[in-house]
Amino acid sequence: MKALTLALFLALSLYLLPNPAHSRFNPIRLPTTHEPASSETPVLDINGDEVRAGGNYYMVSAIWGAGGGGLRLAHLDMMSKCATDVIVSPNDLDNGDPITITPATADPESTVVMASTYQTFRFNIATNKLCVNNVNWGIQHDSASGQYFLKAGEFVSDNSNQFKIELVDANLNSYKLTYCQFGSDKCYNVGRFHDHMLRTTRLALSNSPFVFVIKPTDV
C-alpha cells in the first residue's frame, strides 16, 4: 500500500511540474527569488528621486569592478546598416548611452515610472536618417546562438512595451529588467550574456538578472 501511495504521489508531482515546451523561451522561466514591488511603488534613481516618465537616464551596472558600466547601443552585426545591439560597457566609469523610459499605457497623467508595470525603452542618441527609428528596445531570437537578445530596432508596440522594472534592493535603489510574453503572465529576467566570439557582454533573456541602478543624465 505504501509503495502504491508513493508511486501515485510521484506521478502527481511530475504532472504538476511546468512544461518548458509550453514556453517559446525554453528553458528560462523567470525565477521568483524576489517579491515584485507593488505597482504603486515608484522607481527611484541613485539620488532617491522618482524616475520621471519620458525622462532621460543611464542604466548602469550595480556591481562595481568586473560588473562593467552602463548600457550602450553597439554595432556588432556588420550585415546590419544600423547599430542594433545592447551591450554593457566594460568600463566602470562609463555611464553608457541615455535611455528614455516611458510607461506603456498612454495615460497622459503618468508622470512617474512605477515598478512592476509595463514600460517602453529607447536610446536617446543621435543617429543618421536611416537609423533614426532603430532605437526602440525589443527581444529578438538569434538562431546561431539560440539566445533571445535585447535589441534596438523598429519594434512594434506588442514587442517593445513588454518590459518591467522590478525592485531588487530598496536600500541601494537597485533594479532588474524583466520581459513578459505578449498576452501572457510569463516573464523572464534580462541578464548578461558573455559573447566570447565578439568579446563583449550583451543582454539576453537569462536565469540571472542584470542588476542596475538608474542615474539621471544631468549628474
Swiss-Prot record:
Compartments where located: Vacuole
InterPro entries: Kunitz_inhibitor_STI-like_sf, Prot_inh_Kunz-lg
Signal sequence region: 1-23
Domain of life: Eukaryota
One GO cellular component term: vacuole
Protein keywords: Signal, Storage protein, Vacuole
A Pfam family it matches: Kunitz_legume
Tissue expression summary: Accumulates specifically in tuberous roots and tubers upon tuberization. Sporamin accounts 60 to 80% of the total soluble protein of the organ.
Molecular function as annotated in GO: endopeptidase inhibitor activity; nutrient reservoir activity
Keyword Signal recorded: yes
Purpose: Major tuberous root protein.
Protein family (similarity comment): Belongs to the protease inhibitor I3 (leguminous Kunitz-type inhibitor) family.
Protein's UniProt name: Sporamin A
Organism: Ipomoea batatas
